[in-house]
């Protein structure tokens, strides 16, 4: 069935020490959903479990993201997570530890049918 996109949230997460792409991605998802309350779902006769939640994470090293761990940040719905090249890595002045920044797009959709 076709889906209706209901909301798009964006977030940013940072790992200041360690270049941990998963940690930064989880923080980005948390940032994206932190101020959202999706009470409208019930207006469509649906429950939060009926939602489809599609997450795209942008990081410099997408292969370093544990997508299963990131998916656990979402409390409801059928969740899919993909990691793509993006984000930002800020090198340390000393050439050592860098700051890793992840961006997240969280898209919530509902099935058009009943």
Across the structure, where does each feature detected by a protein language model lie?
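Short, charge-patterned binding micro-sites
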Residues: 47-51
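General N-terminal targeting signals
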Residues: 23-27, 70-74, 98
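Short, hydrophobic/π-rich interface segment
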Residues: 58-85
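C-terminal edge-of-domain segments
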Residues: 76-114
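Conserved mixed alpha/beta catalytic, RNA-binding, or beta-rich assembly cores of soluble enzyme
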Residues: 2-45, 58-65, 105-113
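Extended hydrophobic secondary-structure segments that form protein cores and membrane-embedded regions
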Residues: 53-57
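A generic local secondary-structure boundary/capping motif
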Residues: 43-45, 70-71, 90-97
């Amino acid at each position: 069935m076709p889906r209706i996109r209901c909301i798009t949230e964006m977030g940013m997460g940072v790992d200041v020490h360690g270049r941990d792409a998963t940690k930064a991605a989880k923080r980005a998802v948390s940032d994206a959903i932190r101020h959202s309350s999706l009470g409208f779902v019930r207006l469509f006769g649906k429950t939060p479990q009926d939602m489809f939640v599609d997450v795209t994470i942008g990081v410099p090293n997408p292969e370093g993201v544990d997508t299963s761990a990131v998916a656990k940040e979402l409390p409801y719905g059928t969740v899919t997570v993909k990691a793509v090249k993006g984000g930002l890595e800020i090198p340390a002045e000393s050439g050592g530890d860098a700051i890793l920044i992840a961006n997240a797009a969280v898209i919530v959709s509902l099935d058009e049918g009943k």
